[in-house]
Each structure stands twice: as structure tokens, then as C-alpha cells.
């Protein structure tokens, strides 16, 4: 199993698992460390069985016969043994290792009796982050501050308020505050808040397919932590993007184009940022945020490089005390380093133990937070750079990208065009709309250096072929090369048809397979409005009346009577700001009554017919379920 075919998320999990077994931190797993792992996990296994499993793992994993398992060999063990009894026991042992709490699974997805594990370290880190983020929010006083050493977090998310607030901190204005139920909560109003949180999380690109409101109400730890990590990460990564932070151009390497830099994921940009500063400090580069930072030395030098030097008005210098580097003990050294980070206001996400164990998820968050506060980069002057190429993504592009990510495509889509250039994500979307993909025809990464693009082009040709012949899409004038080269107009034409089909499929499933088109949706909307004695109606998805959002709001009130507070709305002679105000309320209310709406308020104000169609289709789905 090559590293290239393992997703970033999975690589993170594997590094975490590896770090738990590799107790001496030398980068290898020995036979003794495997024995210790099974002892520490207290699994009900006889001694001879532990010996057998250990020998089996060493025999399978130690490919170069050097008496120890490297990280690359460890990846192969995990993938090669996925279904065997040995692997199951091995995974169970890792999950039960210190700092990991194992709990019985009870959700519909997991039959009772299976084990779901969650990380105490993550819980501790997230609680401290949320406490700080919401410490001054009057709506959260009933739960903040939470105690990181108890299960406060899992109870605190149960009413949906904290989740809604954290989503808005990560992507401001996602949720209209007027739609959050805050006072005298009942089981029904709590359910509404949780609908609002889950559907809004989905709209910002969180994968929430297996999470229900009930899971959050019950505070299921592994689901709560999984959702919170996605929300927090989206917020941390928001500005690690060239169009939003032009100073990142300072990270361009010799012979590299702006386009190359724009293709990097936030994780890759963070690694490059750290190495840029380490290089300036004359230090060794790092290749990851786990094993390479365990001794805290890279962190020390990074802090020294980014700390304010006193050369900017109003920002006093902070001189990093490097004496802790001389500490012999790793934990002690990490603690001294974190005390210096605290002087910068950046002691977040990691404890000294998390650093020494190389917890990849929490160290990534620590670095991202440090970058956001002290990037210490300067936009290069006089460089021959096409600043015009730096335009950010359009709202429509962002909506498509968030939709894909919310469905759990792998790898995650950070840049719509470059991340679709091998069509792997497109194939996954075909499967979501019930178009069968012959995976034997698909080339998978890692692609060879020579001829790699040809492999991607073959994928793109197959993707266009599937669209034309299986999905029956209208793809006139679109060739595989257009997807491969990231032609905006033609890529969007395919992506829109994928999203449209996905939306209509949901309606057809609810309606027992009955075919649905635009006219059927418009007729349903008007009939529903009329039956509820509402005065509004729409002629099509281009109807100018939609810019007031009143037809949408009336439809929501028709589906769930009494849900809309009309006192909050302006209904006549609206200016642009009032239209936007209505639209924000409408989109959040649609999500609150249970419609998974991806469109943005601006789509209603500008009457973007594509996105307007998805709003009405999602509401129709909700309305049909009610019948």
C-alpha cells in the first residue's frame, strides 16, 4: 500500500496509532513494544495468543527483515491485514491504549456491542479551545466554561447552541443568530437547533452523513469529537489560502509557478511555511507534524522566527527564551517550549505529552493557530507575479466544493479545479448519483512522474464518457482534457449536473421513484403555498419575486406552520440590505426545519436559478416527508 493512496485523514490516524505503539519514539516498532501494547490494553487473551499475534505481525510487517517495523511497513500491515483476526486484535489493542476511551457503539450505523474509541487528548484540547472562543458569549453561559477533565463537552453540545456558535466562528454568518432557539428550550426546539447545526455544518463542507440529531443529543463522544474537529479545522484553515493571504507567495520556490503553489492543500502550505522559517533559522526541515516535532526543537526555532521583533508599530517585541532546548527530558523540554508559546498567546490544542507523542491532529491544529496569529511573512515586492491569477473562488464554486466535501469524498476538495484534475472525486460523485463506475478502468495515485498526467487524462476521458453515456448528461463540447486542465466553464457544467441529479434523486427516492423536473417542483411549491393560504407564488426559478425571499419563507411556514417570525421581515419596498437580511433568515430557517440547503443567501437575492432550484427542491423533499 503506497503512501500516496492513503488519504490525509487516514494518514493522520495511522500516525496517531503508530505513535501509541512506538513508545520509545525512535520511529520503529519492536517486538517488545508490541508485547507491551497488548499488556497495556488488558485484552482478554492468553499469553500464547499474544505471542502468536506478535510473531504474525512482525513476520507480516517487517518486510526488510531488520527486526523492527518502520512507519511505511506499518501502513502496509494496517491495510494488508484489514479483515484478519490478527488485525482486529491489533486495532483493538491500539484503541484501548492509554488516552483512548473505548465505548460500546449504539447508533444505527454501529450495532450494539461494537467498540467506538475516542481520544481524551482531543476532548481536552477541544474543550479548552471552545471555552476560550465562547467565554464572552452570553448565550453560552449555561455551559461555558466546561471542565476538560469530565464529560461536560458531551452534555454541552446536546442543545445545539454551542455547535451553532462554533460553526459561525469558523465561517462567519453561516447561521442567522435570529434562528437559534436560546431560551426555555423544549425537546422540539432542541431538535430544531440540532437540525440547524447539522445542516449548516454540511453547508460549510463537513461530512455529517452518519451523524443524526439524536447522536448529538445523546452526546456520543466519537461523533461529537469528529464533527467538532471538522468545524474547528475549517476555521483554522480558512486563511491558509493564497487568495485570502497574499503573503503566502513568499513560500514560492525556485522554478515554481504561482499555479503550483495554489494547488497545495492547507496542510501542505503549513508544512512549507514551517520549513520556510526553519530554513531561515538554519535548522533541519521537517516532513510531518508528528514524529519530526516530538523533541520540540523545530517548534522552538519556529517560535523564535515568528515572534514579533518590535519593528511594527504598536506590537511589542517578544524574545523567546531558548534555554529550554537544553532540557534532557522530552516532556520537560516540550513544557518549556509551550510556556514560550503561551507568551505569544498560542498555547492551544497540545499538551507537552501531545507534542512528545507526536499527536498529528492536535499538532496540526497548534501549528495552524500559530500561523493565523503570527504568519511572519511579507508579500514579495518586484517579483514577476500575475496577481490577477490570485482571484478567490466564486460563491458558486465554494458551494459545489462544500457539497462534495459534505458527501465525504476522498481526498477532500480544497481547490475545485486542480483537485478534480484526475477525476477521482468525480467518480465518487457518480456513485452517489447511482451511476456505476468500473473501478478497474480507473487509474489511482500515486501517479508515476513520467506519464502521470496521461493516467489522469485517461480518468477524465472515462469520466466524460460516463456522463454522456450512463448519466445521460448534456456534455456537448466537453472532453476529458477540459477537466484535466481545469477549464472552469466546462468543469462547472459537469459539476452542476452532478449536483442537480443528486438533488432530484433525493426527491425521487422520497416520492417512490416518480420522476421530478423543474416544472413539477414549481407546481408543488405553488400548490403548497396556495393550500396554506399564502399570497406568494413563483412563475419559475428566475422569478424576480424570489429576491425578497418571501416565497421561500412562506413555503417554510407552510411546511412547518408557525415557524417563521414575520415580525423580523421586511415585506415591501426592500432595499438590497433588507433583501439580504430576509435571505439570511430564509436559508437558516430552511436548515432549521430539516432541509439540507447548500445555497447561500446571496443566491436568493440575486435569483441565481441553479441554486434557487436546489433550495426549493430541498424544501419539497422536507414537505413530502411531512405528508
From Swiss-Prot:
GO cellular component: actin cytoskeleton; actin filament; cytoplasm; cytosol; filopodium; focal adhesion; glial cell projection; perinuclear region of cytoplasm
Domain Calponin-homology (CH): 120-236, 264-375, 394-503, 515-624
GO biological process: actin filament bundle assembly; animal organ regeneration; cell migration; extracellular matrix disassembly; positive regulation of podosome assembly; protein kinase A signaling; regulation of intracellular protein transport; response to wounding
CDD domains (alphabetical): CH_PLS2_rpt2 (cd21327), CH_PLS2_rpt4 (cd21333), CH_PLS_rpt1 (cd21292), EFh (cd00051)
Organism expressing this protein natively: Mus musculus
PANTHER family tied to this protein: FIMBRIN/PLASTIN (PTHR19961), PLASTIN-2 (PTHR19961:SF35)
Phosphoserine, modified sites: 5, 7, 30, 257, 290, 323, 406, 474
Positions of post-translational N-acetylalanine modification: 2
Localization of this protein: Cytoplasm, Cytoskeleton; Cell projection; Cell junction; Cell projection, Ruffle membrane
Molecular function terms from GO: actin filament binding; calcium ion binding; GTPase binding; identical protein binding; integrin binding
Species lineage: Eukaryota, Metazoa, Chordata, Craniata, Vertebrata
Annotated region described as Actin-binding 1, given as residue ranges: 106-379
Membrane topology qualifier: Peripheral membrane protein
Protein name: Plastin-2
Domain EF-hand: 9-44, 49-84
Alphabetized UniProt keyword annotations: Acetylation, Actin-binding, Calcium, Cell junction, Cell membrane, Cell projection, Cytoplasm, Cytoskeleton, Membrane, Metal-binding, Phosphoprotein, Repeat
InterPro entries tied to this protein: Actinin_actin-bd_CS, CH_dom, CH_dom_sf, EF-hand-dom_pair, EF_Hand_1_Ca_BS, EF_hand_dom, Fimbrin/Plastin
SUPFAM superfamilies: Calponin-homology domain, CH-domain (SSF47576), EF-hand (SSF47473)
PTM annotation, UniProt: Phosphorylated on a serine residue in response to costimulation through TCR/CD3 and CD2 or CD28. Serine phosphorylation promotes association with the actin cytoskeleton and targeting to peripheral cell projections.
Region (Actin-binding 2): 380-624
Function: Actin-binding protein. Plays a role in the activation of T-cells in response to costimulation through TCR/CD3 and CD2 or CD28. Modulates the cell surface expression of IL2RA/CD25 and CD69.
Assembly mode: Monomer. Interacts with AIF1. Interacts with actin.
Pfam families: CH, EF-hand_7
Residue numbers binding Ca(2+) 2: 62, 64, 66, 68, 73
Modified residues (N6-acetyllysine): 76, 88, 294, 297, 361, 472, 542, 579
Residue numbers of Phosphothreonine PTMs: 291, 353
Amino acid at each position: 500500500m503506497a503512501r500516496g493512496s492513503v488519504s490525509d485523514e487516514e494518514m493522520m490516524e495511522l500516525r496517531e496509532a503508530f505513535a501509541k505503539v512506538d513508545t520509545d519514539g525512535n520511529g520503529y516498532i519492536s517486538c517488545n513494544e508490541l508485547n507491551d501494547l497488548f499488556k497495556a490494553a488488558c485484552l482478554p487473551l492468553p499469553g500464547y495468543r499474544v505471542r502468536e499475534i506478535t510473531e504474525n505481525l512482525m513476520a507480516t510487517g517487517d518486510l526488510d527483515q531488520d527486526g523492527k517495523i518502520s512507519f511505511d511497513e506499518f501502513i502496509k500491515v494496517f491495510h494488508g491485514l484489514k479483515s484478519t483476526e490478527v488485525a482486529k486484535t491489533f486495532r483493538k489493542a491500539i484503541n484501548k491504549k492509554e488516552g483512548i476511551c473505548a465505548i460500546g457503539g449504539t447508533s444505527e450505523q454501529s450495532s450494539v456491542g461494537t467498540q467506538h474509541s475516542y481520544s481524551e487528548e482531543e476532548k481536552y484540547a477541544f474543550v479548552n479551545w471552545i471555552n476560550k472562543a465562547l467565554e464572552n458569549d452570553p448565550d453560552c453561559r449555561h455551559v461555558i466554561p466546561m471542565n476538560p477533565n469530565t464529560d461536560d463537552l458531551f452534555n454541552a453540545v446536546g442543545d445545539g447552541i454551542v455547535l451553532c456558535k462554533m460553526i459561525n466562528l469558523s465561517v462567519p454568518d453561516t447561521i442567522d443568530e435570529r434562528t437559534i432557539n436560546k431560551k426555555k428550550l423544549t425537546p422540539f426546539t432542541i431538535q430544531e437547533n440540532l437540525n440547524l447545526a447539522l445542516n449548516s455544518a454540511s453547508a460549510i463542507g463537513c461530512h455529517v452523513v452518519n451523524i443524526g440529531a439524536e447522536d448529538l443529543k445523546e452526546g456520543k463522544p466519537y461523533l461529537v469529537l469528529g464533527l467538532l474537529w471538522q468545524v474547528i479545522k475549517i476555521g483554522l484553515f480558512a486563511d491558509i489560502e493564497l487568495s485570502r493571504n497574499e503573503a503566502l507567495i513568499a513560500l514560492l520556490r525556485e522554478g515554481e509557478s504561482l499555479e503550483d503553489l495554489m494547488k497545495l492543500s492547507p496542510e501542505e502550505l503549513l508544512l512549507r511555511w514551517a520549513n520556510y522559517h526553519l530554513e531561515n533559522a538554519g535548522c533541519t526541515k521537517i516532513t510531518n507534524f508528528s514524529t519530526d516535532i516530538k523533541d520540540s526543537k523545530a517548534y522552538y526555532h519556529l517560535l523564535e522566527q515568528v515572534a514579533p521583533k518590535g519593528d511594527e508599530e504598536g506590537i511589542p517585541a517578544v524574545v523567546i527564551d531558548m534555554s529550554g532546548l537544553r532540557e534532557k527530558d522530552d516532556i520537560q523540554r516540550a513544557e518549556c517550549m509551550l510556556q514560550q508559546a503561551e507568551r505569544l498567546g498560542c498555547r492551544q490544542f497540545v499538551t507537552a505529552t501531545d507534542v512528545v507523542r507526536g499527536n498529528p491532529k492536535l499538532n496540526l491544529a497548534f501549528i495552524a493557530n500559530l500561523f493565523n496569529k503570527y504568519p511572519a511573512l511579507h508579500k514579495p515586492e518586484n517579483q514577476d507575479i500575475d496577481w490577477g491569477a490570485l482571484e478567490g473562488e466564486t460563491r458558486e464554486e465554494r458551494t459545489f466544493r462544500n457539497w462534495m466535501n459534505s458527501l465525504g469524498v476522498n481526498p477532500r476538495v480544497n481547490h475545485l479545479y486542480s483537485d478534480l484534475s484526475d477525476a477521482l472525486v468525480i467518480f465518487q460523485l457518480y456513485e452517489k448519483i447511482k451511476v456505476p463506475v468500473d473501478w478497474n478502468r480507473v487509474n489511482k495515485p500515486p501517479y508515476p512522474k513520467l506519464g502521470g498526467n496521461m493516467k489522469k487524462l485517461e480518468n477524465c476521458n472515462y469520466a466524460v464518457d460516463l456522463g454522456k453515456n450512463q448519466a445521460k448528461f448534456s456534455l456537448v463540447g466537453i472532453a476529458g482534457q477540459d477537466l484535466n486542465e481545469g477549464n472552469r466553464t466546462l468543469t462547472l457544467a459537469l459539476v452542476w449536473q452532478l449536483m442537480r441529479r443528486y438533488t432530484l434523486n433525493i426527491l425521487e427516492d422520497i416520492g417512490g421513484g416518480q420522476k421530478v423536473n423543474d416544472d413539477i417542483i414549481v407546481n408543488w411549491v405553488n400548490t403548497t403555498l396556495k393550500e396554506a393560504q399564502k399570497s406568494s407564488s413563483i412563475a419559475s426559478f428566475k422569478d424576480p419575486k424570489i429576491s425578497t425571499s418571501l416565497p421561500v419563507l412562506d413555503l417554510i411556514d407552510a411546511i412547518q406552520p408557525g415557524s417563521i417570525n414575520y415580525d423580523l421581515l421586511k415585506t415591501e419596498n426592500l432595499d438590497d440590505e433588507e433583501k439580504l437580511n430576509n435571505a439570511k433568515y430564509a436559508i437558516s430557517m430552511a436548515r432549521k426545519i430539516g432541509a439540507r440547503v447548500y445555497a447561500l443567501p446571496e443566491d436568493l437575492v440575486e435569483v441565481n436559478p441553479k441554486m434557487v432550484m436546489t433550495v426549493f427542491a430541498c424544501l419539497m423533499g422536507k414537505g413530502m416527508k411531512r405528508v
